[in-house]
From Swiss-Prot:
UniProt name for this protein: Leucine--tRNA ligase
Family: Belongs to the class-I aminoacyl-tRNA synthetase family.
Keyword Repeat: no
Pfam families the record matches: Anticodon_1, tRNA-synt_1, tRNA-synt_1_2, tRNA-synt_1g
Motif ('HIGH' region): 36-46
Domain of life of the source: Bacteria
InterPro entries cross-referenced by the UniProt entry: aa-tRNA-synth_I_CS, aa-tRNA-synth_Ia, Leu-tRNA-ligase, Leu_tRNA-synth_edit, M/V/L/I-tRNA-synth_anticd-bd, Methionyl/Leucyl_tRNA_Synth, Rossmann-like_a/b/a_fold, tRNAsynth_Ia_anticodon-bd
Keyword field contains Cell cycle: no
Motif ('KMSKS' region): 602-606
Length: 835
């Protein structure tokens, strides 16, 4: 099998089978899988992702489209730097070696990529364009530097964006993330929050789950900003944001973030307060607040109520208010907010009901809208009426105004790492921040770097960062932070349109290919890569690089590949190939000691539940692997890897070769019986496989092709064979299977005597009239109860149906000699005889 696969891979390469032109009279179709990080090896999860994309690309080519199906490398990132530290070598060497190996693996799987458009994000010829783009953003005030609290990963020694912190830990290292106050570069994604939110409704070919995740991440809140005066210091105020300002008369405390500026200015930092601030610094995302037990510590400060100066409220540092949401301060209304209620119970704060409810708010918060009570002039108003009234009063008093808030924050793009795209800025003591002139781009990374595992090597390099200021020509220093690697992947899909363009994009080529018609990747990128790419596309549109404002018309999120985990008697993880099954138990191959099978989980290096792709290819071939990852589960669901599953796929491919030999030896027989049912199944399969592929029901398409294969096999085994339909059916089967298992189908197609390559052929056509059955079965009911069934010819009349069904013995028994009162027909389905 490997020889056949290598043969066809060589032919495709020599014939430039999958290279496409930007100038074609055909309609375009752009299918793209998320580009991989060159970690060293392609894993089975990659193969599933890329196999899905390859089926779609090959199918759309067969449908007459000019299909762009490119591949490249998201090549900057921490693993390369960690490998450099470990091996004392440059990350570039490690990265390029991995790319070479992974490209070879991808080609060995037979994916139909246009390799002439390959991109590599760590190539200066690629990243020089994003450096220029960053400078353009800076000129438009869409890029800026400021000091802020950031998420610090103590293991990777770098800053993480909010989206890269999962359950309080770094998304890559797993380390507990802390807060640090550092100067960082940001992009003003918040300027586009409203458009990013509004356009979600137009992404009709995206999964609802992803659209919902983006909506929640952007998190639009409509309410009011207003001020509370600090008691005994009325010139100082605390500004709060609230989505329910109408509950102001139920306020019992002011909650502030642990890093609110007022703490530094006015709060005496007792050991209790300092300990609490340290504890809070580990909470980095609002999603974590929902899980955390609500806690607080009193600051010693009080504020006065804006509508009644006799009411004073304590100011409390809480662990559920974040500085980067709203103003970093809220007023707590325990009767009508669950977080506030939990804290009030814990700290013995008052719980005052201000919305009418048929429940005890001392026990549980009532969070719905309703009629206002205990609220002075707001009594009797609905929640919405009271909201408008109270905001109007804030505006009259000059203490507040209506406001819209977003959970989305500006994107922090600074990373304190070496292996990333250098940020093209210079710091001058005289001129301040100075952009690198366009003519001096790209700013490249030095080759002579010392990796000792401590901080950013660019900071310690003896010469790289020392330059003269472009403005005053005095000594200055380069910015040593590099871009977040999501910067590169936020625009790469535009580069494929013409990877040799002298500018960031070839606009004419982008106008032809964009938007991407189908983008395929994991749902874990819903609020990072996918949101950033949407943001970049909007800005690139404004910079005249592209004409579209949304990058991806359709999105498909595939499931993960899972495998059982195994541990030995010492609790050490084992690779699957180290384990053998005997009966219902598992044993270590070498020691024969009993092995414990654990949960079926996502494949990971740490738990060793990995499958070595090269070993699988040697044993079964690329086609069998492709078929298995597509056939055993719907593509959007998780797939459990199983040895029996891939063995079954290998047997199916071998069966195709046996079928070819059997059919090739058949002689035309004028006495053979015409098999109308097989002919109908051929046309039925063509129609429904096409529909299944269009709807990404690839496992169902494979099941239909297996059914056709079985029907053809059954016909071959008969004494009198319909040779004509068997040959036609097998030809069709080979064509239908080609997008899934391209190597063996091209081989069989050639052996069948065909000169044209399968990759150049159109998808088989079906005849609608051939789908009609000669007969159909109807359910026969008496007074709505099923009594019998009967098979009718398609030519039968309604009167004949009535006569036949009434005369059926089971019906006659129910009639007991009576005449039917009425007979109701549901065409080709039901006859209901009423007595």
């Amino acid at each position: 099998m490997n020889q056949i696969e290598q043969k066809w891979q060589y032919i495709w390469q020599e014939e430039k089978a999958f290279e496409v032109s930007n100038a074609s009279s055909k309609p375009k179709y752009y299918v793209l899988e998320m580009l991989p990080y060159p970690s060293g090896k392609i894993h089975v999860g990659h193969v599933r992702n890329y196999s899905i994309g390859d089926v779609i690309a090959r199918f759309m080519t067969m449908q007459g489209f000019n299909v762009l199906h490119p591949m490249g490398w998201d090549a900057f990132g921490l693993p390369a730097e960690n490998a450099a530290i470990k091996n004392n070598s440059h990350p570039k060497k490690w990265t390029y070696s991995n790319i070479k190996n992974m490209k070879k693996q991808l080609k060995s799987m037979g994916f139909s990529y246009d390799w002439s458009r390959e991109i590599n994000s760590c190539d200066p010829e690629y990243y020089k364009h994003e450096q220029k783009f960053f400078l353009e953003l800076y000129e438009r005030n869409l890029a800026y530097q400021k000091a802020s609290f950031v998420n610090w990963d103590p293991v990777d020694n770098t800053v993480l964006a909010n989206e890269q912190v999962v359950d309080g830990r770094g998304w890559r290292s797993g380390a507990i993330v802390a807060k640090r106050y550092l100067k960082q570069w940001f992009l003003k994604i918040t300027d586009y929050a409203e458009e990013l939110l509004n356009e979600i409704q137009n992404l009709k070919e995206w999964p609802e789950a992803v659209r919902s995740m983006q909506e929640k991440w952007i998190g639009k809140s409509i309410g009011a900003n207003f001020h509370f005066k600090i008691k005994d210091n009325e010139e100082t105020t605390i500004e709060v944001f609230s989505t329910k300002p109408e509950t102001i008369f139920g306020a019992s405390f002011i909650g502030i973030a642990f890093n609110h500026p007022i703490i530094e200015r006015l709060v005496s930092k007792t050991p209790e307060i300092l300990a609490f601030i340290t504890q809070c610094s580990h909470i980095t995302r609002s999603s974590e607040l929902e899980k955390a037990e609500k806690e607080g510590v009193f600051t010693g400060l009080f504020v006065t109520h804006p509508f009644d100066s006799n009411i004073v409220l304590p100011v409390i540092i809480t662990n559920f208010v974040l500085m980067d949401y709203g103003t970093g301060a809220i007023f707590g209304c325990p009767a009508h907010d669950e977080c506030d209620h939990e804290l009030a119970v814990k700290m013995n704060l008052s719980i005052k009901q201000v919305i009418k409810a048929d429940m005890d708010v001392q026990k549980t918060a009532y969070t719905e809208d309703g009629i206002l009570i205990n609220s002075d002039v707001l009594n009797g108003l609905t929640s919405n009426e009271a909201k408008q009234e109270v905001i109007g009063e804030f505006e009259k008093l000059g203490i507040g105004k209506r406001s819209v808030n977003y959970r989305l924050k500006d994107w922090g793009i600074s990373r304190q790492r070496f292996w990333g795209c250098p940020i093209p800025m210079i710091h001058c003591e005289i001129c301040g921040i100075v952009p690198v002139p366009y003519k001096d781009l790209p700013v490249t990374l030095p080759d002579d770097v010392n990796f000792d595992g401590h901080g950013n090597p660019l900071d310690h390099h003896p010469s790289w960062k020392h330059v003269n200021c472009p403005k005053c020509d005095k000594p200055a220093v380069r910015e040593t932070d590099t871009f977040d690697t999501f910067f590169e992947s936020s625009w790469y899909f535009t580069r494929y349109c013409n990877s040799n363009a002298t500018e960031m994009t070839d606009k004419k080529a982008c106008d032809y290919w964009l938007p991407v018609d189908k983008y395929i990747g994991g749902i874990e990128h819903a609020v990072m890569h996918l949101l950033y790419a949407r943001f970049f596309t909007k800005v690139m549109n404004e910079q005249n690089y592209v004409s579209v404002r949304e990058p991806f018309k359709g999105l498909f999120t595939q499931g993960m590949v899972l495998h059982a985990t195994y541990k030995d008697e010492h609790n050490n993880w084992l690779y699957p190939e180290e384990v053998v099954k005997k009966g219902n138990e598992f044993f270590h191959k070498e020691s024969n000691n009993r092995v414990v099978q654990g949960r079926i989980e996502k494949m990971s290096k740490s738990k060793k539940n990995l499958i070595d792709l090269e070993t699988m290819q040697e044993q079964y071939g690329a086609d069998a692997i492709r078929l298995f990852v597509l056939s055993d589960s719907p593509p959007e669901k998780d797939l459990e890897w199983s040895a029996s599953g891939i063995e079954g796929c290998s047997r199916f491919i071998n069966k195709l070769e046996y079928m070819f030999k059997a059919i090739d030896s058949l002689k035309d027989d004028v006495n053979s019986e015409v098999n109308k049912e097989l002919n109908r199944l051929v046309h039925f399969t063509i129609k429904h496989v096409a529909e299944d592929i269009k709807h990404f029901a690839l496992n169902r398409a494979i099941a239909r092709m297996r059914e056709l294969s079985n029907a053809i096999s059954a016909e071959i085994s008969k004494d009198k064979i319909d040779v004509k339909i068997v040959r036609h059916g097998f030809n069709v089967l080979v064509q239908l299977l080609n997008p899934f298992i391209p190597h063996i189908t091209e081989e069989i197609w050639q052996k069948l005597g065909n000169k044209e390559r399968l990759y150049n052929l159109s998808f088989p056509a079906f005849d609608e009239s051939m789908l009609e059955l000669d007969t159909y079965i109807m359910a026969v009911q008496v007074n709505g109860k099923l009594r019998d069934t009967y098979e009718f010819k398609t030519s039968v009349s309604e009167d004949e149906i009535k006569q036949v069904t009434v005369s059926l013995p089971k019906v006659q028994k129910c009639l007991e000699g009576k005449e039917p009162k009425k007979i109701i027909l549901v065409p080709r389905k039901i006859v209901n005889i009423l007595v």
